[in-house]
UniProtKB/Swiss-Prot annotation:
Residues 1-70 form a transit peptide. Involved in metal homeostasis. Specifically binds Cu(2+). The truncated isoform has less specificity in metal binding. GO terms for molecular function: copper ion binding. Pfam families: CutA1. It comes from Arabidopsis thaliana (Mouse-ear cress). The keyword Transit peptide applies. Expressed in flowers, leaves, stems and roots. The lineage of its organism: Eukaryota, Viridiplantae, Streptophyta, Embryophyta, Tracheophyta. This is Protein CutA, chloroplastic. Knockout lines indicate that CUTA is not essential for copper tolerance or accumulation. Homotetramer. Keywords: Chloroplast, Copper, Metal-binding, Plastid, Transit peptide. A central prokaryotic signal-sequence-like domain may be used to export the protein to the chloroplast envelope after import into the stroma. GO terms for cellular component: chloroplast; chloroplast intermembrane space. Belongs to the CutA family.
Length: 182
């Protein structure tokens, strides 16, 4: 079993991506762990982040997490997410953040300066200074938000990564609901 696990881990760590991801974070969604095949390595994202995938598959399947990671909708709140988007500079970040909030695709966008992203692009390891947008919005707005980012972003492959909000201040989450479109 140890050699089988070692072989699988080596395959995952040594695998190449089928497309480059530009950005600060490469996140494995717990919702897609069960879809990973044990016989083939994950084909996108940060391959080095997936050394524990075989261990997580048995303990943390999407069925085990599906009820616990989704925030329950109440009369005052809706299922909500945090979305990470990287931008090349402050000007691009402000422009994109303003358009997202103006279109009511998000209640709030934080602009975090001074991040360093290391990634592979066109066969070469690159390193760039970027800024990170932390976007708080409704789960139901992920698709239109992603379309908006893709249409208004300078990158060929902009990073758009969503994480569920599993809880928080009821007043803040109510404000998030009321500040975004239905």
């Amino acid at each position: 079993m140890a050699s089988s696990l070692t072989t699988r881990l080596s395959a995952v760590i040594g695998s190449r991506r089928s497309f480059p991801i530009v950005g600060a974070f490469c996140v494995l969604s717990t919702l897609s762990i069960s879809s990973l095949s044990s016989s083939s390595p994950f084909k996108s994202g940060c391959a080095q982040s997936f050394s524990v995938v075989p261990l997580l598959r048995s303990k943390f399947s999407s069925k085990a997490f599906s009820s616990s990671i989704r925030m329950e909708e109440s009369s005052k709140t809706v299922p909500s997410i945090v979305v990470y988007v990287t931008v090349p500079n402050r000007e691009a970040g402000k422009k994109l953040a303003n358009s997202i909030v103006q279109e009511k695709l998000a209640a709030c966008v934080n602009i975090v300066p001074g991040i360093e992203s290391v990634y592979e692009w066109e066969g070469k390891v690159q390193s760039d200074s970027e800024e990170l947008l932390i976007i708080k919005t409704r789960q139901s707005l992920l698709e239109p938000l992603t379309e908006h980012v893709n249409a208004n972003h300078e990158y060929d492959v902009p990073e758009v990564i969503a994480l569920p909000i599993t809880g928080g201040s009821d007043k803040y989450l109510e404000w998030l609901k009321n500040s975004t479109r239905n």
